[in-house]
Design a protein with these regions (language model features):
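N-terminal helical cap/lid subdomain that shapes the substrate entry/recognition surface
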Residues: 2-114
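Asp-based, Mg2+/Mn2+-dependent phosphohydrolase catalytic module
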Residues: 1-6, 18-19, 121, 136-238
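Short beta-strand/loop segments at the ligand-binding rim of alpha/beta enzyme cores
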Residues: 127-130, 183-185
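Catalytic-core regions built around general acid/base machinery
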Residues: 115-126
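Glycine-centered short loops/turns at secondary-structure junctions
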Residues: 126-127, 205
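Conserved phosphate-coupling serine/threonine residues in phosphotransfer and NTP-handling enzymes
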Residues: 133
Length: 238
């Protein structure tokens, strides 16, 4: 292998996104006063909250899939997910204000996996390293720049700024152009999403590694060059 550039996803690859999402969602509802004592009682409030959270996760997941397909833009995604739960659960909140508060809380959520910092330090010692993410710009910059991995990242590439989302090959071509890499065999994309990271890397003609930390079954027909189930396994590949 003759890699010079490692492109790597952020959420569920380097950072634990479910933990980030859970903390941000709960803190948003706390700040909005949802858990203030009422005649419903704490147990009932918690039960309702869990139902709202579960529904939000389903709505949000589908919207991000739609984003990858180009069926929705990110500005709309940020608000419509809250519009849906506000309507379905008859909540008395403004979806735009709720979205802004939630994004602020997301930006405070820094939960790297145990091996993340060591991995980034190792990669930085051998290669140029770029994070490539479809995440929301203000959220991702806040999380990365306030984390211990910031000093090991040469470039943060966010779809908001490039104008296209993974799996569009142009975001990977943008990264290669930034690092002045012409030979595609010198580049590898590492990430947890088969549909965004692996398919995107393949669209761009570069090697790929699927980070399958949750032991998911791959029934997509999208086959990565490598698969790891622990971040530590990347040391053996790279």
């Amino acid at each position: 292998m003759n890699y010079k550039l490692v492109l790597i996803d952020l959420d569920d690859t380097l950072f634990d996104y479910p933990r980030t999402e859970e903390a941000a969602f709960r803190n948003t509802f706390k700040e909005l006063g949802f858990f203030v004592e009422s005649e419903l009682g704490n147990a009932k409030k918690e039960e309702i909250y869990e139902k709202i959270k579960d529904r939000y996760k389903d709505v949000n997941l589908q919207l991000w899939k739609d984003l990858e397909k180009g069926a929705v833009d990110k500005d709309r995604l940020k608000v419509v997910r809250f519009e849906k739960i506000i309507e379905e659960f008859d909540l008395k909140y403004d979806p735009h204000e709720m979205s802004e508060l939630y994004l602020k809380k997301l930006g405070e959520g820094i939960f790297p996996f145990e091996a993340t910092e060591k991995l980034c330090e190792y990669l930085h010692s051998k290669y140029k390293v770029g994070i490539v993410t479809n995440g929301i710009k203000e959220v991702q910059y806040s999380r990365i720049e306030n984390s211990e991995i910031a000093k090991y990242i040469d470039k943060i590439i966010i779809s908001d700024e490039v104008g296209v989302n993974k799996p569009d090959k142009r975001i990977f071509e943008y990264a290669m152009n930034y690092f002045e890499i012409r030979d595609k065999s010198q580049v590898i994309m590492i990430g947890d999403s088969l549909g965004a990271d692996i398919k995107g890397g393949q669209n761009a003609g570069i090697d790929t590694c699927w980070v399958n930390l949750r032991n998911n079954v791959n029934d997509t027909g999208i086959i990565p060059k490598y698969e790891v189930r622990k971040l530590e396994e990347l040391f053996e590949i790279l």
